[in-house]
């Protein structure tokens, strides 16, 4: 397993994302490069739970190396990692691809587990804003359906949990088979999908108390 934490920084005007290249979904933002790296490392333990579910060992300590800085865009400043790294254009080696897809699957498992134990009504912000549990889940699932289209995977609107599982299985299969067709690079797609799932799984956890 990688022990050096290779990170690329996605630098928007208002937000900077620190993205762990070898660990899809482990992406956090702050207002400066240094703060974004600190925020990334602050989530090491939480991301470690995902690695355990995937059967992958996350090293306890990391030698952080920033390998690239890319300009962010409006989506970066909105709060989502939006710009691929240059290395994403290179095909992932088979073991790395399998490992990263397993981490994506583990993020789905974590979200399902968190949702199953969360209250239906989540704690709101100071002005009463924010989604409740089921609305968060609906948002994640619909976003995934849109993301999947960027890889050539098209599914009609969901009518049951089985439809969600089928779409996710097809998405993982397409990524593993190298059959993805669309504007998103596979490495970036795995990172973005996994980040979105984890960001909302952690949101549900944080707002369940």
Where are these regions (language model features)?
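Short, contiguous alpha-helical
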Residues: 6-8, 14-33, 37-56, 101, ...
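Transmembrane alpha-helical segments of integral membrane proteins
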Residues: 171-178
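Charge-rich, acidic-biased intrinsically disordered regions
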Residues: 64-67, 132, 163
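Long amphipathic alpha-helical segments with strong coiled-coil/leucine-zipper propensity
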Residues: 93-105, 116-117, 122-123
């Amino acid at each position: 397993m990688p022990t050096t934490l290779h990170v690329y920084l996605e630098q928007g005007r208002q937000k900077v994302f620190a993205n762990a290249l070898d660990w899809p979904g482990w992406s956090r933002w702050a207002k400066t490069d240094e703060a974004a790296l600190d925020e990334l490392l602050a989530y090491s333990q939480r991301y470690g739970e995902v690695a355990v579910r995937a059967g992958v060992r996350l090293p306890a300590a990391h030698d952080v190396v920033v390998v690239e800085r890319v300009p962010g865009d409006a989506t970066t400043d909105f709060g989502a990692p939006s710009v691929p790294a240059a290395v994403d254009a290179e095909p992932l080696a088979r073991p790395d691809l399998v490992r990263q897809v397993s981490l994506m699957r583990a993020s789905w498992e974590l979200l399902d587990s968190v949702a199953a134990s969360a209250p239906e009504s989540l704690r709101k912000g100071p002005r009463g804003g924010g989604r409740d549990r089921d609305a968060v889940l609906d948002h994640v699932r619909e976003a995934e359906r849109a993301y999947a289209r960027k890889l050539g995977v098209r599914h009609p609107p969901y009518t049951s949990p089985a439809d969600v599982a089928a779409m996710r299985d097809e998405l993982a299969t397409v990524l593993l088979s190298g059959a993805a067709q669309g504007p998103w690079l596979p490495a970036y797609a795995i990172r973005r999908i996994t980040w979105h799932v984890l960001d909302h799984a952690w949101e549900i956890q944080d707002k369940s108390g």
